[in-house]
Design a protein with these regions (language model features):
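Active-site neighborhoods and metal-handling regions in enzymes and metal-associated proteins
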Residues: 1-225
Length: 225
């Protein structure tokens, strides 16, 4: 394994530890707002790893806001006792980027719990599909993620199914260049080398929603390991 990928894996392991600590510290409680939870996680990340830099905006979304994709900036909701919420943070550990997303269910709603399980199972199914196909475009993987949503009886909620990840500061991911994303217009092999002749690394993100019930779930981590 090349040193570049090893650093990305180390960064992700730290992100995973941060997310576990969120639960251990009891930060996920009803009655607080999304912004308050966001600030608490920011403070926890600083205490654990001295993190102050994030390569994308920090996302905490609860209730109907879990329907919203990354680009939107919905109203600040208060967490309810039976809520579903997801957290999507992109912390930078010693100049290496992580991008980690998880979903949590505060109450005992079985449909919400099913959604939280389904997105994790779908993520691993997506990785297995990627690993099986030694040549695969972003469009092909995105289409498969949509097929998984149908299999689990949800709707795929994102315009993308993932993106490139790397060393900070990396070249900005231009939204107009779909080859940077797991996107229906990306016809390039995801395993193609970059302009420097180096391997590219990808994040896979699964966002399933039920628009009628106004719930969504999100699961995200490093794909190319």
């Amino acid at each position: 394994m090349n040193p570049f990928k090893q650093e990305l894996i180390k960064a992700e392991k730290k992100a995973e530890k941060l997310f576990k600590e969120i639960e251990i510290q009891g930060l996920l409680i009803p009655g607080i707002t999304e912004k308050e939870l966001n600030a608490s996680i920011f403070n926890l990340a600083f205490e654990l790893f001295s993190i102050e830099k994030y390569w994308h905006k920090r996302i905490v979304r609860a209730g109907k806001n879990t329907l919203k994709p990354y680009d939107e900036n919905p109203e600040n909701l208060t967490l309810k006792p039976d809520d579903i919420l997801f957290i999507d943070f992109g912390p930078i550990f010693e100049e290496w980027e992580a991008d980690f997303g998880r979903t949590y269910v505060l109450g005992n709603d079985m449909l919400k719990k099913k959604l939280a399980l389904d997105i994790e199972h779908a993520w691993w199914a997506g990785k297995a599909y990627f690993d099986k196909h030694k040549k695969i475009t972003g469009a092909e993987l995105y289409a498969y993620c949509n097929t998984l949503a149908q299999k689990y009886q949800w709707e795929f909620g994102g315009e993308i199914g993932g993106h490139l990840i790397g060393h900070f500061p990396h070249e900005r991911l231009e939204k107009e260049d779909k080859t940077n994303y797991i996107h229906p217009e990306n016809k390039v092999d995801m395993r193609a080398l970059d302009q420097k002749g180096e391997e590219r690394n990808w994040i896979l993100e699964i966002h399933f929603v039920d628009k009628e019930k106004e719930i969504g779930g999100f699961f995200e981590q490093l794909l190319t390991i």
